[in-house]
């Protein structure tokens, strides 16, 4: 099940915890809606769209299939490490696993600003990787098990 960011924003105005009300929601497509995750993750009545999406990403699906958040980032904001650092901090302090893929689209002239990384968490037996795709304009932030079925995960990334 998927949801566009525009529909999500409208639904969130009616039911603030809409993402928790949809336990099988796997994809949010916000490529053209201009928002990214915000921390702290929260889905209460005063939470922003970005906080609610962060809360949704960090709530695992019951079948261990990764959630997918597709977004684009506005390069005029300037401080891009501040967008990625909360993911690293949450990963470093995690005690339970969660699977997700964040597909981030950039303007071509700004894609150089990001440095790929790969981290592991021995307690959760997970890895967090930020890497460029075949396109110079798209990066993936992937949180997944260290030992995983590569074919299954590659299918999810498409």
Residue map of PLM features:
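The conserved beta-strand core of Leucine-Rich Repeat
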Residues: 1-158
């Amino acid at each position: 099940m998927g949801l566009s960011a525009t529909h999500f924003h409208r639904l969130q105005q009616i039911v603030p915890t809409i993402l928790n009300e949809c336990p099988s929601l796997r994809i949010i497509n916000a490529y053209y809606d201009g928002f990214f995750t915000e921390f702290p993750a929260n889905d209460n009545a005063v939470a922003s769209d970005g906080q609610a999406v962060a809360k949704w990403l960090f709530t695992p699906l019951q079948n261990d299939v990764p959630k997918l958040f597709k977004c684009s980032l506005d390069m005029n904001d300037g401080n891009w490490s501040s967008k990625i650092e909360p993911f690293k901090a949450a990963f470093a302090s995690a005690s339970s696993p969660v699977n997700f893929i964040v597909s981030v689209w950039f303007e071509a002239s700004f894609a150089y600003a990001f440095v790929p990384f790969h981290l592991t968490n021995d307690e959760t037996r997970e890895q967090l990787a930020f890497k460029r795709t075949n396109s110079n304009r798209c990066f993936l932030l992937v949180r997944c098990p260290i030992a995983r079925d590569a074919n299954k995960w590659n299918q999810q990334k498409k």
